[in-house]
């Protein structure tokens, strides 16, 4: 289990350094959960960049969709043999224990991340416009922030509202940073 979390920390540090630094600012008891969630985000975000074949990216993303079902399912379920899936399963069930376990909202947010990336992979052309980009940023980055807030015990409408705006801003900034000139 420890090596799975170490893998998550390494992946986030290597591929999303800003998020790594932000996660270090969280209280110690919430860092591993946040790192597992952020590593999940890294893995799903890199699915498209890992191959030039869209169908292979879709296969990888559908695998992550199944991994979410296992990670957010029954506590006794066995996650797929991938360090991020193992850490995600453990972190979700440990951190969400105080709120009655992993619920529908957690599955909804995790699935929103994967589903948005699947829709992106299925596009044969550039995104159709700003509303698509806003929705994509909301479903990927804002959903991730909702999960982290919830894992930290923050259940507040104002915090969720701020996370929605911040998630869209981070998502659009990342899209712009990755755009080719």
Regions found by a protein language model. Give the residues of each.
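Acidic catalytic motifs of isoprenoid enzymes
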Residues: 1-168, 172-181
């Amino acid at each position: 289990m420890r090596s799975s979390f170490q893998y998550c920390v390494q992946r986030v540090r290597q591929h999303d350094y800003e998020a790594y630094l932000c996660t270090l600012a969280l209280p110690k008891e919430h860092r591993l959960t946040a790192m597992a969630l952020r590593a999940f985000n890294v893995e799903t975000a890199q699915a498209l960049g890992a191959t030039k074949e869209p169908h292979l990216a879709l296969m990888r993303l559908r695998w992550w969709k199944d991994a979410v079902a296992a990670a957010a399912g029954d506590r006794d379920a066995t996650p797929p043999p991938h360090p991020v899936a193992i850490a995600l399963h453990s972190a979700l069930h440990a951190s969400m224990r105080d709120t009655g376990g992993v619920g529908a909202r957690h599955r909804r947010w995790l699935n929103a991340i994967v589903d948005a990336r699947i829709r992106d992979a299925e596009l044969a052309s550039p995104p159709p416009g700003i509303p698509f980009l806003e929705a994509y940023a909301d479903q990927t980055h804002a959903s991730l922030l909702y999960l982290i807030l919830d894992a930290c015990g923050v259940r507040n409408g104002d915090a969720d509202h701020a996370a929605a705006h911040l998630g869209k801003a981070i998502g659009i900034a990342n899209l712009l940073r990755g755009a080719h000139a």
